[in-house]
Curated annotation (Swiss-Prot):
Domain commentary: The RNA gate region regulates mRNA cap recognition to prevent promiscuous mRNA-binding before assembly of eif3d into the full eukaryotic translation initiation factor 3 (eIF-3) complex.
Pfam families: eIF-3_zeta
The keyword Nucleus belongs to this UniProt entry's keyword annotation: no
GO BP, sorted A to Z: cap-dependent translational initiation; formation of cytoplasmic translation initiation complex; regulation of translational initiation
Protein name in the entry: Eukaryotic translation initiation factor 3 subunit D-1
Species classification: Eukaryota, Metazoa, Ecdysozoa, Arthropoda, Hexapoda
C-alpha cells in the first residue's frame, strides 16, 4: 500500500507590515485613526498606575490660576487603586517599652537627633511619641507648586519707597556714586587727637542725684525754656575768623558724624559742600530735618509714614529732639547760685545785650591733620561738666533715648527690664537706633568728652506724646562705647577723607552729597552756585549783618509735637 503526498496544500503567507520612515526625526509621521481623540494623562514612571486618564480636567481660561499649565505629575494619585491587605492575618503585638538599665538611658539620644535631622531638637522635624512629623515649613516645601505667587511677587505688599531729603533737579550733574560695601572697607589709621584752637560758651555742672533714678523712683521730664542754637558752618563767626589762618576743610561735629556714620543710615540726608580755592566748607541746608533725631531708623519694622499719627517718623523725630534737649538741661544744676564752668570766650551766637536764657553748651573748635596737607577744623560741643573728687572737670555729652510704644517698636518693656536687664534694653536700642547712637559716639569722641551720659525717657502713656518720665541713666567712656558698638574710628576717618579727596579734585563751585533714600549709596552732585539761595531768610541776623540760622525754642514749640 502506498501513500500519496498532496503537494497542493495551501500554507499561510507572511505579509510584510508597512513601516513609516521619518526622514526628519524619529517616531511615526502620522497618527493612526484608531488612536485619534484618545485622552492622555501625563504620568511619571515613579507614580503608581491607577487609571488611564482623567476626564475631570476640563479646560478653562481663568487667569486666576496661573500655574494650571504646570506639571501634572502625581495629580491622579488620589484616584489610584490600592490593594487592601487581608486582615485575617493581623495579629496584635506588644509594644510596651522595655525598661533599660540606668546606665543606658538617653545614651544615643543626642547622637540620633543630630544625625537623622528628625529629632525634637534637630532641623526638619518634631518627635512626638516616637512619630516623626514634618514641621509646617517643611510640609510646604514638599510641594514645589505651592507658594508660586509669593515667589514671583504676586502676593504681599510692595516694598516701601522712602522720599529723598531733597528733590534732584535736572540741572544737577552726578559725579560719583559710593556704595556702602566699598565705604566700609576704607580706613585712615593713626589720626591723632584734635588740637584745641578756641573754646567758647558756659557749662553747668551735672546733678549726680539723677544717677539714683530707677523705674520705681522715676522722675517727670520737665520742659526747660532755653534756646538751643543750631548754626551751620559758614554762619559761624568763629569758623569764619579761623578760616583765614587755619585749616582748609571746615565743618561741624553733627555734619562730620553724619558722614562718618553714613554706612549705618537708612533715611535720606544731604550736605552742601562749597569749594573755594583750596578750601572746603561743609554746610547743612537751613530749616530742614537735618538736626532732628531719628527714631527706630535701623529697625526691622520702622515707623509707618502716617502724618496724622503721633508715631510717624517725622513726629517721632520732633518728639525725640524735644526730649533730648530738655533732658540734657534738666540733669544740670541750674540757678544763679550754682557754679558754672566758663570757657575762654563767651557764646559766639548771642550778643552781650541780649537777655535770653541759652542752653548750657560749650563749644570747642579743634583741628586735625588728615595727611596730604589736609587740615580739618570743626566745631564740637559739650553738654555739661562733672566735678571729680580731685577737682579736675570732666566734660560730658548728654543724650537721651526715648521709648514711645514697645509693642509697635518690637522692643522690650523698659519698666519691666530696665532695672534687671539693662543690657538687653541697650542691645535692643543698638539694633533699632544704630545710626543715632553711632553719631552720638562720634560727636563725643571728636569733642574729647570724658563721659557719654545716656538717659532713658519713656512716655507716661503710649498714646500721649507730650508727657514723659525719666526711668534711669547710664554712662560710658566714648572710646570704650565705640568698641562696644563695633564703631571703627579708622573707618570713619577713611570715609570722610574719601569724600574730601573727591571734592578736592573738582573745580570751584557748589556740590551736594546725598544718601539715596532706598539704596545703600551716597551720590555726589555738581549743583549750580545759586542753588538753595532762595531758601535763605534774613531772620535772626547778627549785629554785623551776618545771617545766622534760626534758633529753635523747643519748650515753646512743645505744643506742636
Amino acid at each position: 500500500m502506498s501513500e500519496t503526498i498532496n503537494t497542493s496544500a495551501q500554507f499561510p503567507t507572511f505579509e510584510k507590515p508597512t513601516v513609516q520612515f521619518n526622514e526628519k526625526g524619529w517616531g511615526p509621521c502620522e497618527l493612526p485613526d484608531t488612536f485619534k481623540d484618545v485622552p492622555y494623562q501625563p504620568f511619571s514612571k515613579n507614580d503608581r498606575l491607577g487609571k488611564i486618564c482623567d476626564w475631570t480636567n476640563t479646560s478653562n481660561n481663568d487667569k486666576k490660576y496661573q500655574n494650571k499649565y504646570a506639571s501634572s505629575f502625581g495629580t491622579g494619585i488620589q484616584y489610584s487603586y490600592y490593594h487592601e491587605e487581608d486582615e485575617t492575618t493581623f495579629h496584635l503585638v506588644d509594644t510596651a517599652r522595655v525598661q533599660k538599665p540606668p546606665h543606658q538611658r538617653g545614651r544615643f539620644r543626642n547622637m540620633r537627633n543630630s544625625r537623622s535631622g528628625r529629632g525634637r531638637n534637630a532641623r526638619g522635624g518634631i518627635n512626638t511619641h516616637g512619630m516623626t512629623t514634618l514641621s509646617g515649613k517643611n510640609v510646604k516645601a514638599r510641594d514645589p507648586r505651592r507658594g508660586m505667587g509669593k515667589k514671583f511677587g504676586n502676593r504681599g505688599p510692595p516694598p516701601k519707597m522712602r522720599e529723598s531729603s531733597v528733590a534732584v533737579r535736572s540741572d544737577w550733574a552726578s559725579i560719583e556714586e559710593m556704595d556702602f560695601p566699598r565705604l566700609i572697607k576704607l580706613s585712615l589709621p593713626n589720626i591723632k587727637e584734635g588740637v584745641d584752637i578756641a573754646t567758647c560758651g558756659t557749662l553747668e555742672y551735672y546733678d549726680k542725684t539723677y544717677d539714683r533714678i530707677n523705674v520705681k523712683n522715676e522722675k517727670p521730664l520737665q520742659k526747660i525754656d532755653r534756646i538751643v542754637h543750631t548754626v551751620t558752618t559758614t554762619d559761624d563767626p568763629v569758623i569764619r575768623r579761623l578760616s583765614k589762618t587755619v585749616g582748609n576743610v571746615f565743618a561741624t561735629d553733627a555734619i562730620l558724624a553724619t558722614i562718618m556714620c553714613s554706612t549705618r543710615s537708612n533715611y535720606s540726608w544731604d550736605i552742601v559742600i562749597e569749594k573755594v580755592g583750596d578750601k572746603i566748607f561743609m554746610d547743612k541746608r537751613d530749616h530742614t530735618e537735618f538736626d532732628l533725631l531719628t527714631v527706630n531708623e535701623t529697625s526691622v519694622e520702622p515707623p509707618t509714614d502716617d502724618d496724622s499719627s503721633c508715631n510717624s517718623p517725622r513726629n517721632l523725630a520732633i518728639e525725640a529732639t524735644f526730649i533730648n534737649h530738655n533732658f540734657s538741661q534738666q540733669v544740670l544744676k541750674t540757678g544763679d547760685q550754682e557754679a558754672k564752668f566758663k570757657f575762654e570766650e563767651s557764646n559766639p551766637f548771642i550778643s552781650e545785650d541780649e537777655d535770653i536764657q541759652v542752653a548750657s553748651v560749650g563749644y570747642r573748635y579743634k583741628k586735625w591733620e588728615l595727611g596730604s596737607d589736609i587740615v580739618l577744623v570743626a566745631r564740637c560741643e559739650h553738654d555739661g561738666v562733672l566735678q571729680t573728687p580731685s577737682g579736675e572737670p570732666q566734660f560730658m555729652s548728654i543724650k537721651a533715648l526715648n521709648e514711645w510704644d514697645s509693642k509697635m517698636a518690637n522692643g522690650v518693656e523698659w519698666r519691666q527690664k530696665l532695672d534687671t536687664q539693662r543690657g538687653a534694653v541697650l542691645a535692643n536700642e543698638l539694633r533699632n537706633n544704630a545710626c543715632k547712637l553711632a553719631k552720638w559716639t562720634v560727636q563725643a569722641v571728636l569733642a574729647g568728652s570724658d563721659q557719654l551720659k545716656l538717659g532713658y525717657v519713656s512716655r507716661i502713656n503710649p498714646r500721649d506724646h507730650s508727657r514723659h518720665v525719666i526711668l534711669g541713666t547710664q554712662q560710658f567712656k566714648p572710646h570704650e562705647f565705640a568698641t562696644q558698638i563695633n564703631l571703627s574710628m579708622d573707618n570713619a576717618w577713611g570715609i570722610l577723607r574719601c569724600i574730601i579727596d573727591l571734592v578736592m579734585k573738582q573745580r570751584d563751585g557748589k556740590y551736594l552729597i546725598m544718601k539715596d533714600p532706598n539704596k545703600p549709596i551716597i551720590r555726589l552732585y555738581d549743583i549750580p552756585d545759586n542753588t538753595f539761595d532762595s531758601d535763605d531768610s534774613d531772620d535772626g541776623e547778627g549785629d554785623d549783618g551776618e545771617g545766622f540760622q534760626q534758633v529753635y525754642n523747643y519748650a515753646n514749640n512743645s505744643n506742636k509735637i
